[in-house]
């Protein structure tokens, strides 16, 4: 039965091919214009955050009675990788991290199960534990942030304006969530006059209870009539500050007005909530998150349009400034990559024209937009957005997708020159090349299989690379057997070669150069075949040398971003108040204002910035924490400011832990160098961590070396004498309540204003809340209403305790982190430090560990996830080779050419000083498919020549000479197509590794593979 010929079918139905070309181009343009646009691809955060509080508890009590119980329960969650907990004072935060190989569709059910487990365990926790607050939407990105500021307006007035804008902006399509930053909680302070309280013989607890009862919402019941249910509503809840002041208090058979013994004032919570400043001015931030699947650029334009309308309603004196504009960044990024895509197309076309001639080159050129357009359609239908990875993948694929078209049109040209007709030439090209091309295309695709099958956050971040390459390469094969023959039939001339008598001077020069080159190449082949042992030993030696050189190449997981932001994170001593942190921020504000390198800057006091880019890791709220997001005018300004700012902050704030860094590409890590120490005993863990820190102190490349478990903080322990307290009619509860009311205030009720719930805070008169020396003389109310100094019923001792306790998998864990000098790569330095700790690690007690943390740990995990599916890749490649070559010996020869790429990879990375990271490793793995593809072409041709009756040695030399041009041409097209990617910080490691490896491997394949063939079959 005659084999079905796709090219023959296409030539008989040219109108259908032209029609679908037009349709695909049209829908491709539509898809490109309507695809979602993002800066970075999405990846699923496999982390849930659980917050709990137990007011009054010490960190150790909180850890023992609350954190450990919840953490132990959550360790039983199916799919959990590890838990990590942070106990700060009487608050605790637990991070639940799922395994990276857990499928994305299993994550949401896992979080539901975690919620159920927390609810089950909650019953066993001590009374008074508050919470839990659960955040399983840890990856929300607030790409657009605005700041509302105005010196003439109060925080509350700014908040009201921000709330109004928020309500209006929620109507914009694709708005997912809007959060306000820096909102200061209003509180209605009820400040009690202690003397009047004593004269009425009313206790603090009695008054507090009376206020609470008055502000409680209590159901009044329902009357059921024959026709209706009528609900009863009893008025009396606080609806304005005056109502609180006029509230009647009935205690000890007397009715009093609260205002007679207290001052009622509206103020802000003290200590304050986390604060937000825009260029040194107090502000309210409006952070806007976009729905998944939205077009970031269009979303930004819609927000801008809405705000342009709303700005007219903003009162004079209030300023609305943009802090973060991710849509603008995305637009620039997509524009840059689109330009790189067109540059790559132009480069590939030039290669085609230069090597194939004008008409033949035009056929290849017209095939490219068909493939690219169809790829856009499939991307659009499969929900793959335009971002740095998907567009970079298209650029990468460009150099590969023209290979099949080049092979087809070149074969057509050869047959036309031999006098064949267009139809016969095109159909013969399909018969002779279609299935070897398909095998080669599938093998090239198989090189990207490890990434497609890999699990984990990093693989998810880069997965669209493999999918887009698969699409483009498979489509390129169909285009080469359907579109290229039709276009070649129309465009390529049926012209026999000119007789030598008609040659021009240029023709003679080109002919002579070609003859000379191929003559020298044949001589080289003859020499190599005659010295096969020497050639194989040299090749093996070069490969071994490359393997040994790999550890010498600097390593970097992912490079820093090229965005203009600098992130400055500062952690002051653990016991620092938020007021102290705010005062330090004012000093920094003055230093930054007017700086020539800065466009804008914002500060977050007591909190970190919202996640305005996916690769930014949010910070916990802490009174001693300060973060700046500084946007510079250019990359050059960013680097200059970084070099100026880091030493200034370290010198000006010696007690603070300063971390100045750029935004990252890829999954985030807080510090470039991170190690962790874990073990069962907290004291021993600290001792080991101090040894590690001391060792790191001697490394000149490191600075700002510190723990995430800070030094102890002062605590005043008040020991109540129960006998003395009992004689005075009080107990420890009454003393604690009195001190809380005196120093910090006690929540005694709520006051409702619109959608605001304002706490009513009960305070006892003027106090010495900021004066530790006055603690012993603080007045404590007795049972009869009189006052005695605290020292009369208690002894006060000052001690030190851990302000923070970190656990990982319920074990005390300390993370030691450091910054690095300019030019030093964090990953490489982390592994270097880890190796230098060998003596400490060898002497660790049983149960204690020192492990990689941060980016270094993530890189090891990511590479393991990438390498794990490689056996599947190998199986697929071997299977395709067996079907194509049909002999085990030939299959192994083709496989053995793949490692040759490593020689070129090591050379290229060393020459360009490019670090070896995740993308470079990905390039090395993907490179193997391309090298094996070239081997198939050569081995297949040798077998064809032998089948035609050529002697084995003659077949080897003729095949290498004949296939030299197409193999080199496709390799050069792939290499030159990578040039636009070499300018990208993210893509350059892959592009350089791939190009260097392919260049060297292609040259070696044309020499070493014939030698391997001759050696195996003993051909002389």
Q: Language-model segments: which ranges?
A:
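Transmembrane helices with small-residue packing motifs
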Residues: 15-16, 23-57, 61, 119-126, ...
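Extracytoplasmic/periplasmic membrane-proximal domains and adjacent transmembrane bundles
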Residues: 9, 18, 51, 122, ...
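Solvent-exposed, membrane-proximal periplasmic/extracellular interface segments of envelope transport
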Residues: 4-6, 61-137, 195-216, 237, ...
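Helix-loop junctions and hydrophobic alpha-helical segments within the transmembrane domains
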Residues: 323, 330, 334, 409, ...
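Flexible hinge/switch segments at interdomain interfaces of large molecular machines
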Residues: 37-48, 85-90, 128-150, 179-185, ...
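Transmembrane alpha-helices and their membrane-interface boundaries in multi-pass membrane transporters
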Residues: 398-412, 434-453, 460-507, 628, ...
């Amino acid at each position: 039965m005659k084999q079905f010929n796709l090219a023959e079918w296409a030539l008989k139905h040219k109108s259908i091919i032209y029609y679908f070309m037009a349709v695909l181009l049209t829908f491709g343009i539509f898809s490109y214009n309507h695809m979602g646009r993002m800066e970075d691809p999405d990846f699923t955060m496999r982390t849930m955050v659980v917050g709990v509080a137990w007011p009054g508890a010490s960190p150790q009590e909180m850890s023992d009675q609350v954190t450990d119980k919840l953490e132990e329960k959550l360790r039983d969650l199916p799919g959990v990788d590890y838990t990590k907990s942070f106990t700060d004072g009487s608050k605790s935060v637990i991070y639940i991290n799922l395994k990276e190989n857990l499928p994305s569709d299993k994550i949401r059910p896992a979080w539901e199960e975690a919620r159920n487990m927390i609810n089950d365990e909650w019953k066993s926790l001590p009374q008074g534990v508050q919470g839990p607050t659960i955040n399983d939407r840890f990856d929300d990105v607030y790409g657009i942030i605005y700041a509302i500021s105005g010196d003439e307006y109060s925080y509350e007035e700014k908040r009201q304006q921000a709330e109004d804008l928020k309500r209006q902006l929620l109507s914009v399509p694709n708005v997912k969530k809007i959060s306000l930053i820096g909102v200061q909680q209003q509180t209605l302070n009820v400040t009690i006059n202690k003397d009047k309280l004593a004269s009425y013989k009313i206790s603090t607890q009695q008054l507090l209870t009376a206020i609470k009862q008055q502000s409680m919402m209590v159901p009044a019941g329902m009357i059921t009539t024959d026709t209706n249910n009528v609900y009863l509503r009893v008025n009396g809840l606080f609806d304005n500050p005056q109502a609180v002041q006029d509230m009647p208090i009935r205690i000890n058979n007397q009715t009093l007005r609260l205002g007679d013994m207290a001052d009622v004032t509206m103020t802000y919570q003290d200590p304050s909530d986390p604060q937000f400043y825009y260029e040194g001015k107090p502000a309210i931030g409006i952070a806007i998150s976009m729905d998944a699947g939205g077009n970031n650029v269009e979303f930004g334009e819609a927000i801008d349009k809405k705000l342009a309308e709303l700005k007219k309603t903003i009162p004079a004196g209030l300023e609305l400034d943009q802090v973060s504009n991710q849509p603008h960044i995305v637009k620039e990024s997509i524009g840059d990559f689109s330009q790189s895509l067109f540059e790559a197309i132009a480069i590939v076309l030039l290669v085609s024209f230069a090597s194939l001639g004008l008409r033949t080159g035009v056929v290849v050129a017209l095939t490219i937009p068909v493939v690219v357009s169809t790829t856009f359609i499939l991307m659009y239908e499969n929900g793959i957005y335009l971002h740095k990875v998907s567009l970079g993948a298209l650029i990468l694929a460009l150099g590969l997708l023209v290979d099949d078209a080049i092979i087809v049109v070149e074969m057509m040209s050869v047959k036309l020159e031999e006098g064949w007709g267009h139809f016969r030439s095109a159909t013969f090209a399909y018969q002779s090349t279609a299935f070897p091309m398909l095998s080669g295309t599938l093998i090239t695709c198989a090189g990207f299989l490890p990434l497609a099958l890999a699990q984990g956050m990093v693989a998810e971040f880069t997965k669209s690379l493999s999918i887009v390459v698969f699409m483009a390469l498979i489509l390129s094969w169909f285009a080469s057997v359907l579109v290229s023959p039709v276009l070649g039939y129309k465009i390529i001339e049926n012209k026999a070669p000119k007789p030598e008598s008609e040659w021009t001077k240029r023709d003679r020069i080109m002919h002579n150069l070609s003859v000379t080159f191929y003559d020298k190449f044949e001589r080289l082949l003859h020499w190599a075949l005659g010295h096969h042992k020497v050639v194989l030993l040299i090749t093996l030696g070069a490969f071994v040398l490359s393997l040994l050189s790999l550890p010498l190449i600097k390593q970097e997981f992912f490079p820093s971003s090229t965005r203009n932001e600098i992130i400055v994170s500062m952690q002051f001593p653990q016991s620092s108040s938020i007021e102290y942190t705010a005062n330090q921020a004012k000093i920094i504000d003055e230093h930054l204002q007017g700086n020539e390198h800065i466009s804008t800057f914002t500060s977050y006091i007591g909190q970190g910035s919202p996640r305005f880019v996916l690769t930014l890791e949010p910070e916990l709220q802490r009174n001693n924490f300060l973060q700046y997001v500084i946007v510079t005018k250019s990359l050059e300004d960013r680097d200059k400011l970084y070099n100026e700012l880091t030493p200034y902050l370290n010198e000006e704030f010696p007690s603070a832990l300063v971390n100045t860094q750029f935004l990252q590409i890829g999954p985030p890590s807080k510090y470039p160098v991170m190690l962790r120490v874990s073990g069962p005993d907290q004291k021993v863990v600290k001792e080991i961590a101090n040894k590690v820190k001391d060792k790191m102190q001697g490394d000149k490349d490191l600075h700002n070396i510190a723990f995430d478990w800070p030094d102890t903080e002062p605590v005043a322990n008040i020991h109540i004498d129960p006998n003395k307290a009992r004689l005075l009619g009080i107990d420890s509860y009454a003393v604690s309540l009195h001190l809380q009311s005196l120093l910090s205030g006690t929540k005694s009720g709520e006051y409702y204003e619109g959608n605001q719930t304002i706490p009513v805070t009960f305070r006892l008169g003027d106090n010495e809340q900021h004066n530790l020396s006055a603690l012993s003389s603080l007045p404590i109310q007795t049972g009869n209403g009189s006052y005695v100094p605290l020292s009369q019923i208690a002894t006060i001792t000052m001690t030190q305790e851990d302000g923070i306790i970190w656990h990982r998998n319920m074990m005390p864990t300390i993370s030691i982190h450091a910054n690095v000098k300019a030019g030093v790569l964090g990953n490489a330095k982390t592994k270097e430090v880890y190796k230098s700790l060998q003596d400490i690690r060898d002497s660790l007690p049983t149960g204690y560990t020192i492990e990689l943390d941060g980016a270094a740990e993530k890189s090891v995990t990511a590479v393991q996830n990438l390498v794990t599916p490689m056996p599947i890749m190998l199986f697929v490649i071997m299977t395709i080779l067996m079907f194509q070559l049909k002999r085990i010996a030939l299959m192994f020869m083709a496989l053995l050419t793949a490692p040759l790429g490593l020689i070129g990879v090591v050379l290229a990375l060393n020459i360009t000083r490019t670090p070896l990271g995740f993308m470079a490793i990905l390039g090395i793995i993907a490179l193997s498919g391309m090298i094996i593809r070239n081997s198939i072409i050569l081995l297949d041709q040798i077998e064809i020549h032998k089948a035609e009756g050529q002697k084995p040695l003659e077949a080897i030399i003729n095949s290498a000479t004949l296939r030299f041009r197409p193999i080199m041409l496709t390799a050069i097209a792939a290499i030159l197509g990578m040039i636009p990617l070499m300018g990208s910080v993210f893509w350059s490691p892959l592009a350089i590794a791939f190009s260097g490896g392919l260049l060297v491997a292609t040259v070696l394949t044309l020499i070493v593979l014939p030698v391997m063939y001759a050696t195996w079959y003993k051909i002389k």
